[in-house]
Amino acid sequence: MDRSAEFRKWKAQCLSKADLSRKGSVDEDVVELVQFLNMRDQFFTTSSCAGRILLLDRGINGFEVQKQNCCWLLVTHKLCVKDDVIVALKKANGDATLKFEPFVLHVQCRQLQDAQILHSMAIDSGFRNSGITVGKRGKTMLAVRSTHGLEVPLSHKGKLMVTEEYIDFLLNVANQKMEENKKRIERFYNCLQHALERETMTNLHPKIKEKNNSSYIHKKKRNPEKTRAQCITKESDEELENDDDDDLGINVTIFPEDY
């Protein structure tokens, strides 16, 4: 079986499976992005999370949903309010931790070149911890990730260790991260649409590719500092650089793993 046929087989099998996530469906903020990728011949998504704020209890088992020895006392993909956290904390028997987990997306790609397009758009959109994995069987996976998470302990052995004022402060930080996370998702989706439209036009009209390459070389000589994608504004760049300084300069990384 050739690679293209094998990829189509993998895609059909993956998209026909039931959603086994806790929620059981794709998060609202990434539905359009996921559908857009799955409609393309060269991609399909294997998992996603739009980002969430959650309160975990790592301690005595309670009646909440269990996962990896933790109780999920609260989880939301929207902005969170203090009253909900205070009520949820009353159920904690062990060590309760407030977390914000940013957007994550895993996409299997038909070829490495396809993954590189997504990777470039992810990096330019602020997801600077993104990477590509190539398996021994030829499976090429892209993980879209960032590092602007949050994890703060609130209680120990069921005893609250912080004030309500501090919880309110933490939620303001978490909510700001959630709002920035949503902006990055929208930026990634918009950049991806433009990039794939350009790729389609280039494939349909090979002469455009030659012309664009010549124009790019000419512009690069005139303005060597202008290297970022057109869809990212200067203001957005500064905002992202301030938030993810540790991730600047990440390039495509390929890890040989077996699937």
From Swiss-Prot:
Keywords: Methyltransferase, Phosphoprotein, S-adenosyl-L-methionine, Transferase, tRNA processing. SUPFAM superfamilies: SSo0622-like. InterPro entries: tRNA_yW-synthesising (IPR003827), tRNA_yW-synthesising-like_sf (IPR036602). One of its GO terms (biological process) is tRNA methylation. Pathway: tRNA modification; wybutosine-tRNA(Phe) biosynthesis. One of its GO terms (cellular component) is cytoplasm. Its EC number is 2.1.1.282. It catalyses: 4-demethyl-7-[(3S)-3-amino-3-carboxypropyl]wyosine(37) in tRNA(Phe) + S-adenosyl-L-methionine = 7-[(3S)-3-amino-3-carboxypropyl]wyosine(37) in tRNA(Phe) + S-adenosyl-L-homocysteine + H(+). Signal peptide: none annotated. One of its GO terms (molecular function) is tRNA methyltransferase activity. It comes from the Eukaryota. The modification Phosphoserine is found at S25. Probable S-adenosyl-L-methionine-dependent methyltransferase that acts as a component of the wybutosine biosynthesis pathway. Wybutosine is a hyper modified guanosine with a tricyclic base found at the 3'-position adjacent to the anticodon of eukaryotic phenylalanine tRNA. Belongs to the TYW3 family. This is tRNA wybutosine-synthesizing protein 3 homolog. It comes from Homo sapiens. The gene is TYW3.
